[in-house]
């Protein structure tokens, strides 16, 4: 009936001059309401308001739309007068009142003004008026009463710090997703929440103040039985984060202020955990994580705080970064088939970082940067982690200088079952006058490296001379099981390297492929 009425209005409005009636094809009017609402969901609130003036039919359609995107800047531009903002909120409140009982599926409220074009003008990128803030909160509560399911509030450009955020919003039974981005508004757990069961599945809080951290996370643990995602980004006043949930699957904590004192997580179904602590954060008094089904872990902080990866039996990938040392990345399966170790340039001690995954067996694929290779050489014979089962190794090296060659030998000696070797040219790059001509093929043969008898594939980037060419010769002449080799050269030395290596007395029947390094990569190098 509603669709027929809309088509009648469209036809009746198309009378030509002189009384002659013409019918106009109105495809939009023929659409079901559900499809029409999907199309309208791409419009801002201002556009919906304009469209509602076309006809009574369009007004009813706009008012019944379940999706709204309110952007204050699109409505009043650079105006910074509180009166203008209050009039705008009057229109919004009127619009919400006219909706009656129509349900809101998603409401996005954006009051994040861009910086003023003229810095010397009186215009500001934020409105510090309390009246405007409380009127906005009043509008938000009206939205909540419309049984909203998804609510996104970007209020960074609104109000002064430490204004209260209405905790009654957390008591909305229909609410499934809530995102709050404020100018350090104060959040508290709802007071009458002892018997309330929230349907929240996704809660994202950014730049907010958690006034009662113990009470707030107790409310999440006890009342949010359906929650799956919890994000806390640049939150304030969280000293104790204690959370217990059987439904939570993703937890993210980024740079809490001030530093955490306790972090206790007990989430049996947690699959993704991301923790980013501030640099040089002090040691926590309590750090306990129970997550038997954890699959992905990201941890960033200082050496004072780190998890024990051995506890996570279902872990598929992990990256642990320390501001003063470097990072360890582990990928795929609980035995970590891919491991990346990147140390900072001047780090000379690998042992603190290795404590993160002490006792684990690193299998399959290993990627090392130059700093890590040098540290392993210093720790030869006393490495706290075994790499005996590594089958694929990639060395990211700036240049194969005389200084790095003994370190490379040390690493290769600890991997007797290596099948794939890739030596890649990566920053930091050394000066051209660096010594690169002290180790010939004879040196490599004297090392009696066990991996050479199992090596099947190798790739090497030759962008400088002698040491790296001699290493390539060693592989070609001694790797009897070699199946394929790829040699990447710059355009300037491709033919010369090819002529030199073609003279090798290869012990295998491997296919050797010579490739020119792409120009885009050469520009990055030189």
What do the PLM-derived regions correspond to, one by one?
Residues 196-313, 319, 399-420, 462-479:
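Plant-skewed but cross-kingdom recognition/interaction modules and surfaces
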Residues 2-20, 419-526:
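C-terminal closing repeat unit and adjoining cap/tail of repeat-based domains
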Residues 68-71, 107-109, 149-154, 178-181, ...:
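Conserved hydrophobic beta-strand positions in leucine-rich repeat
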Residues 2, 21-247, 254-256, 450, ...:
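Leucine-rich repeat
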Residues 29, 33-37, 56, 86-93, ...:
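Amphipathic alpha-helical interface elements that mediate macromolecular binding in regulatory proteins
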Residues 319, 342, 355-367, 374-375, ...:
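N-terminal helical submodule of small eukaryotic multi-pass membrane proteins
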């Amino acid at each position: 009936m509603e669709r027929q009425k809309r088509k009648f209005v469209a036809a009746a409005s198309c009378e030509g001059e002189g009384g002659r009636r013409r019918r106009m094809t109105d495809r939009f009017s023929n659409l079901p309401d559900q499809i029409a609402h999907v199309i309208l969901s791409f419009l801002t609130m201002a556009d919906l308001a304009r469209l509602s003036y076309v006809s009574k039919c369009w007004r009813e359609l706009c008012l019944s739309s379940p999706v709204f995107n309110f952007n204050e800047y699109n409505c009043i531009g650079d105006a910074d007068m509180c009166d203008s903002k209050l009039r705008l909120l009057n229109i919004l409140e009127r619009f919400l009142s006219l909706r009656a009982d129509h349900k809101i599926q998603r409401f996005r409220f954006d009051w994040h003004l861009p910086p003023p074009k003229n810095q010397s003008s009186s215009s500001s990128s934020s409105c510090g008026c309390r009246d405007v803030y409380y009127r906005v909160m009043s509008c938000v509560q009206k939205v909540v009463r419309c049984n909203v399911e998804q609510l996104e509030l970007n209020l960074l450009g609104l109000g002064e710090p430490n204004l209260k955020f209405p905790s009654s919003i957390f008591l909305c039974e229909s609410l499934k997703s809530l995102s709050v981005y404020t100018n350090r508004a104060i959040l508290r757990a709802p007071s009458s929440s002892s018997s309330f069961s929230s349907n929240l599945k996704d809660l994202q809080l950014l730049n907010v103040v958690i006034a009662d951290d113990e009470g707030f996370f107790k409310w999440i643990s006890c009342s949010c039985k359906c929650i799956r995602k919890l994000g806390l980004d640049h939150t304030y006043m969280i000293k104790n984060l204690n959370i217990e949930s059987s439904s939570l699957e993703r937890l993210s904590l980024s740079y809490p202020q001030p530093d955490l004192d306790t972090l206790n997580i007990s989430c049996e179904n947690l699959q993704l955990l991301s923790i980013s602590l501030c640099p040089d954060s002090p040691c926590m008094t309590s750090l306990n994580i129970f997550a038997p089904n954890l699959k992905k872990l990201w941890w960033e902080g200082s050496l004072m705080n780190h998890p024990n990866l051995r506890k996570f039996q279902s872990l598929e990938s992990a990256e642990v970064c320390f501001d003063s040392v470097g990072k360890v990345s582990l990928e795929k399966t609980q035995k970590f088939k891919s491991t990346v170790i990147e140390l900072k340039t001047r780090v000379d001690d690998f042992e603190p970082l290795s404590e993160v995954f002490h006792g684990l067996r690193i299998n399959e694929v290993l990627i090392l940067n130059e700093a890590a290779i040098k540290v392993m050489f210093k720790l030869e014979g006393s490495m706290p982690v075994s790499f005996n089962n590594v089958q694929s190794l990639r060395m990211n090296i700036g240049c194969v200088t005389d200084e790095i060659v003994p370190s490379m030998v040390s690493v290769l000696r600890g991997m007797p079952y290596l099948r794939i070797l890739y030596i890649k040219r990566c920053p930091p790059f050394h000066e051209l006058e660096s010594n690169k001509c002290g180790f010939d093929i004879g040196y490599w043969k004297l090392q009696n490296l066990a991996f050479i008898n199992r090596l099947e594939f190798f790739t090497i980037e030759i962008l400088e001379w002698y040491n790296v060419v001699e290493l390539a010769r060693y592989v070609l002449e001694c790797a009897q099981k070699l199946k394929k080799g790829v040699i990447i050269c710059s355009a300037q030395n491709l033919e010369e390297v090819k002529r030199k290596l073609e003279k090798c007395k290869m012990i295998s029947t491997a296919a050797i492929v010579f490739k020119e390094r792409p120009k885009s990569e050469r520009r990055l190098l030189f």
